[in-house]
């Protein structure tokens, strides 16, 4: 799934250069969603991996 987030990130960067519209705009939206999903997953994994003192 991380692979797909990188693919959509590349599409989003290309869309930013060429202008946001059509399929490019959709790729930007998907890239934003995947970014926040992975951010939440990382935060949960980080907090669950810590040991209680």
From Swiss-Prot:
The keyword Transmembrane helix applies. The chain crosses the membrane at residues 6-26, 28-48. InterPro entries: DUF1328. One of its GO terms (cellular component) is plasma membrane. It is a multi-pass membrane protein. Belongs to the UPF0391 family. This is UPF0391 membrane protein Acid_3618. It comes from Solibacter usitatus (strain Ellin6076).
